[in-house]
């Protein structure tokens, strides 16, 4: 099934990939992305681990409807989370490049 040294090479590749993925996950957790809603009136900045770092609200919204403001904050957070997920996929793709991973396989991170 495995050629000469094939299993050993496969295990070595898997270990190297795991180490690269761990390092990349640590880097991603430190990155910050900002999501926006209401044409930039509300901005939410989160890190790669989806922890909220900052919320910015344009002063003009403080006089408006509370429900609308809450919706805008939620939308901005969701936008930031989507951007963080996309960034994570891009970064991890560079780690798994060349590995025989089936299409659509969801990585455990």
Curated annotation (Swiss-Prot):
Subunit record text: Homodimer.
Classification via Gene3D superfamilies: Nucleoid-associated protein YbaB-like domain
A molecular function GO annotation: DNA binding
Organismal lineage: Bacteria, Pseudomonadati, Pseudomonadota, Gammaproteobacteria, Pasteurellales
Protein name: Nucleoid-associated protein MS1507
Region entry Disordered, spans: 1-21
Family membership: Belongs to the YbaB/EbfC family.
Matches recorded under InterPro entries: YbaB-like_sf, YbaB/EbfC
């Amino acid at each position: 099934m495995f050629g000469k040294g094939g299993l050993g090479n496969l295990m070595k590749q898997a270990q190297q990939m795991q180490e690269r993925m761990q390092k990349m996950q640590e880097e991603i957790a430190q990155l910050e992305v900002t999501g926006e809603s209401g044409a930039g009136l509300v901005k939410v900045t989160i890190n790669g681990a989806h922890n909220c770092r900052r919320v910015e609200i344009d002063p003009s919204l403080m006089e408006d409807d509370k429900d609308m403001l809450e919706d805008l904050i939620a939308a901005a957070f969701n936008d930031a989370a989507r951007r963080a997920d996309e960034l994570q996929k891009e970064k991890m793709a560079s780690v798994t490049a060349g590995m025989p991973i089936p299409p659509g396989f969801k990585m455990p991170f």
